Structure formats: C-alpha cells, structure tokens
Amino acid sequence: YPGFDAAFVQQMKTLCAGADYLLPNITEACFLTDTEFKTEYDRAYIDELIAKLTALGAKTVVLTGVSYQQGKTGVVVYENGTYQYYEHEQIAGGVHGTGDIYASCFVGAKMRGKTAYEAAVIAADFVLECIKESQKDPTHTYGARFEPALCKLMQML
C-alpha cells in the first residue's frame, strides 16, 4: 500500500485516538489494527475490525468497501454501539481518488446536519455516481470524474 510504512501507521494510530469519525477502507483498517487482510470475510471479521478501530479511540467508525455478497459493496457505520450497513451495486474496475471524494462528501453531509449513517449513504451514492461518470469517458484515465455528478450530490444533500 503506497505511502503506508510502519512509522506512518503508528502516527495514524495516534490521530485515531482523538477522532470523532474514522473512515478507513478495509485495507487501511487492517494496517491500523495489525489485522491480517482477507479478500474473503464474514460479518464477524468486519465486527472485529471495527472493535479494534474503536479501541484505538475513535467514537464513530465508517468502514468502507465492505461486501457481504458478490456484486455489492457498501459501508458499515458503527456509532453508539449500533451497526448499520448500506450497500449498492459494485462496479468493476477501480478509479483513483474515490476515498478522498468519499471523505469530503461525508464531512459535507455532516456539516449539513446529516447523521453519520445518512452521511455515509450520501457519500457512497455520490462515489458510485462519480465512478459511473468516469466510465462514460474512455479517454479519462486518472481520477474520478466528480464534476458531472455534483448536481446529483446537491440533490442528495
């Protein structure tokens, strides 16, 4: 994972202790919790990851890239002892920048008064729209095309 050496991970763990919201994907969560990364997993594995993340000090965990069934992907939101899961279609092929877009959208939705779960859903749906927009243009080779989807984001908010 580029940019994630042991020193970086240790510093991130320190930051997690004061975090109100932690939004890692599964790979990042494994680094932060010293957990073996698995390509196939069940709910118990995800629950264990989230428990380890909250043990670092984060109050609310939004774990992205969680897939309990083929063709679907989603997020698990853990807040105040409650788990909520949201999923949508999984689109083949990766697009750079979706994690940054997700985090930015999540924060924007929270600033607009949405709950953590509502913000997680809005961010997931917006990222999905960005990926779809990116795939419409075969000449676009780097980064998610978020600009064409901004109108949809404003409707979601």
Indicate where each model-derived feature is located.
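Conserved phosphate/ATP/ADP-binding segment of small-molecule kinases
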Residues: 2-83
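Residues on a specific face of well-ordered alpha-helices
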Residues: 10-13, 17, 104, 121, ...
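Glycine-rich beta-alpha junction loops
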Residues: 28, 65-68, 90-92, 123-128
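Short pre-catalytic strand/loop immediately N-terminal to key active-site residues, enriched for Gly-Thr
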Residues: 83-96
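Phosphate-handling active-site elements
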Residues: 83-84, 109-123
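Short, small-residue alpha-helix embedded
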Residues: 93-116
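Charged C-terminal helix
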Residues: 117-157
